[in-house]
């Protein structure tokens, strides 16, 4: 449940942009304001202006803000965020995780794709983009402008005729001979490369020259095609979010520190475009000098190659670095070009550094308030349960679709809130489909039927369910054969109300047998709802991944005797998985490397 009063206390009277999130941590609305505090306060008045606003407010679980130096800048940044996130409540503006990159591979017919992680694949990397949504949007845009393939090599190498992407004009079918020459394809690749580098005008100049050449040669069909491409590129350029100052690729880094907590704010600028900002809260030893913290952060942020980050040409910081020259040298060596670190920003860079500083302070204020609120919620829960301390809590939930692809989730909270590195999921197998009780028992045994160090033993275990689920959990604990004290955790069931609305939960306390209904404004209930919702979302996301994996598997992977080479041969000679499924026994047996006996097994397996 979102605590609007606590949130609004720390929102400044500054221009900026705000992003609203729902319970799945998805951005559902982006807005701008001349005065953030006044604008955000208007959402939480008793009488709202429309049903849409009421629905929006009811879905909010958290809000993030970005302070800007002017209302105009807020408008531009709002535009960028809306393009990135495409929130469902910004319907009127729709036309307008390491970090993800866009990869252009180095091959005869390069493909363009989203990419995360260490840069092990040969090719060019463009980014970083602040969110995967920005990458998806850019790829979709590129596919419309420049028909370059985005398919995996396993698909590209096994095509005998063009796919649907060719039919709708999103790919020029380099996979099949006779549809596009290597020179024509490379020209489209070069346009995409220039576009990603921000050299929009060069793309237009090339296309205009091509159109004029085709016109002079009376090749009006190609001239019309180039004309349409020029119009599409111009339409995109007109809508792009570009800084008025053509700044170099740079990251702006600012640090705010208060009460033992540090916030590092990074503002990303690429090709003159402000891609977005992110806040980091590193663990900081007491009395750490901020110059030292800046140097440590810069080193960890850019020099860890496995994170696959691109080092910008310029890094602007707000504290002097003692080892600045050494860090510059290391970063330059890694980037293969000169990288400078500036601690005396002037002009436009100074303006953006001030912007990063404001956002660092605002994010730190919210973080400190959040930490205080978590402490207050923990104290309320300790009082409710009459416990001296609560160091660790865990919560379980089950997710499945009609009993299939069942997943159990376990989330962990410590005194700082969610402890995400300790989150776990469990595949549930060997039970009757839809038997949530058996699924819960199996998950608990997988989690606890082993040795645990003292700090890993939870003080409280929440079970998302009523008496039945709790009793099955107690049964599972009773059957544990472990050395650690299995009676230490307090098992608590969270039973939903009659109409399953938040605030109507009943807590079932295993140690006393009491059933407790708390007031919707109770801080202990807010903490319980938080951990329950985390567990629910963690279970659902795991289940969706498992379901998608099962859906996308071809079916050949499970057939004994069909390895990668035979699988590839089947897909190639029979025209993909649909062709394999529709093939006769004789057609399968005619594939090189497939015996009659194996063909019969494949045929029967896929048919039944």
From Swiss-Prot:
Family, as annotated: Belongs to the UvrC family.
UniProt cross-references to PANTHER family, sorted A to Z: UVRABC SYSTEM PROTEIN C (PTHR30562:SF1), UVRC/OXIDOREDUCTASE (PTHR30562)
Compartment annotation: Cytoplasm
Biological process per Gene Ontology, one example term: nucleotide-excision repair
Disulfide links within the chain: none
GO molecular function ontology, one term from the record: DNA binding
Entry protein name: UvrABC system protein C
Keywords assigned: Cytoplasm, DNA damage, DNA excision, DNA repair, Excision nuclease, SOS response
Pfam families per the UniProt record, alphabetical: GIY-YIG, HHH_5, UVR, UvrC_RNaseH, UvrC_RNaseH_dom
Gene: uvrC
Record note on quaternary structure: Interacts with UvrB in an incision complex.
Transmembrane annotation, as ranges: none
Protein purpose: The UvrABC repair system catalyzes the recognition and processing of DNA lesions. UvrC both incises the 5' and 3' sides of the lesion. The N-terminal half is responsible for the 3' incision and the C-terminal half is responsible for the 5' incision.
InterPro entries registered for this protein in UniProt: GIY-YIG_endonuc, GIY-YIG_endonuc_sf, GIY-YIG_UvrC_Cho, Hlx-hairpin-Hlx_DNA-bd_motif, RuvA_2-like, UVR_dom, UVR_dom_sf, UvrABC_protein_C
């Amino acid at each position: 449940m979102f605590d609007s009063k606590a949130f609004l206390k720390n929102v400044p009277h500054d221009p900026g942009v705000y992003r609203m999130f729902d319970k799945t941590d998805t951005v559902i609305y982006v807005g701008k304001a001349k005065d953030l505090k006044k604008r955000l306060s208007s959402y939480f008045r008793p009488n709202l202006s429309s049903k849409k606003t009421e629905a929006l407010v009811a879905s909010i679980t958290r809000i993030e803000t970005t302070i800007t130096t002017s209302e105009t800048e807020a408008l531009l940044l709002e535009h960028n965020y809306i393009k990135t996130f495409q929130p469902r409540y910004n319907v009127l503006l729709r036309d307008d995780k390491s970090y993800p990159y866009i990869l252009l591979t180095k091959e005869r017919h390069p493909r363009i794709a989203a990419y995360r992680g260490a840069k092990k694949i040969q090719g060019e990397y463009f980014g970083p983009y602040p969110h995967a949504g920005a990458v998806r949007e850019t790829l979709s845009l590129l596919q419309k402008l420049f028909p370059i393939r985005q398919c995996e090599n396993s698909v590209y190498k096994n095509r005998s005729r063009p796919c649907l992407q060719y039919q709708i004009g999103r790919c020029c079918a380099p996979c099949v001979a006779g549809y596009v020459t290597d020179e024509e394809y490379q020209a489209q690749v070069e346009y995409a490369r220039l576009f990603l580098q921000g050299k929009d005008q060069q793309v237009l100049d090339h296309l205009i020259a091509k159109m004029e050449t085709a016109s002079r040669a009376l090749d009006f069909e190609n001239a019309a095609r180039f004309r349409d491409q020029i119009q599409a590129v111009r339409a995109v350029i007109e809508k792009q979010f570009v800084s008025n100052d053509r700044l170099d690729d740079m990251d702006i880094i600012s640090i705010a520190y208060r009460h033992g907590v540090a916030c590092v704010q990074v503002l990303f600028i690429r090709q003159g475009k402000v891609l977005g900002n992110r806040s980091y809260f590193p663990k900081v030893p007491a009395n750490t000098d901020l110059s030292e913290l800046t140097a440590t952060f810069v080193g960890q942020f850019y020099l860890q190659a496995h994170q696959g980050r691109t080092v910008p040409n310029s890094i602007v910081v707000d504290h002097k670095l003692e080892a600045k020259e050494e860090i510059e040298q290391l970063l330059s060596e890694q980037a293969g070009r000169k990288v400078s670190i500036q601690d005396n920003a002037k002009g436009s860079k100074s303006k953006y550094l001030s912007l990063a500083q404001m956002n660092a302070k605002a994010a730190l204020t919210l973080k400190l308030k959040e930490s205080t609120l978590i402490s207050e919620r923990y104290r309320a829960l300790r009082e409710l349960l009459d416990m001296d301390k609560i160091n660790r809590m865990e919560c379980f939930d089950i997710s499945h679709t009609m009993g299939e692809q069942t997943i159990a989730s376990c989330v962990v909270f410590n005194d700082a809130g969610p402890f995400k590195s300790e989150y776990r999921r469990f595949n549930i197998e060997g039970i009757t489909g839809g038997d949530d009780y058996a699924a819960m028992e199996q998950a608990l045994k997988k989690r606890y039927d082993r040795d645990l160090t003292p700090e890993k033993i939870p003080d409280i275990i929440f079970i998302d369910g009523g008496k039945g689920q709790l009793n099955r959990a107690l049964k599972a604990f009773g059957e544990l054969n472990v050395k650690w004290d299995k009676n230490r955790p307090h098992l608590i069931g969270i039973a939903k109300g009659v109409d399953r609305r938040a605030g109507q939960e009943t807590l079932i306390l295993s140690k006393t047998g009491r059933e407790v209904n708390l007031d919707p404004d109770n801080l202990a209930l807010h903490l319980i709802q938080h951990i329950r919702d985390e567990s629910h979302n963690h279970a659902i996301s795991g289940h969706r991944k498992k379901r998608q994996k099962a859906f996308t598997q071809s079916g050949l992977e499970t057939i004994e005797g069909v390895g990668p080479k035979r699988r590839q041969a089947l897909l190639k000679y029979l025209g993909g998985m649909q062709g394999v499924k529709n093939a006769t026994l004789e057609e399968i047996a005619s594939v090189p490397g497939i015996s009659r006996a194996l063909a019969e097994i494949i045929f029967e397996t896929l048919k039944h």
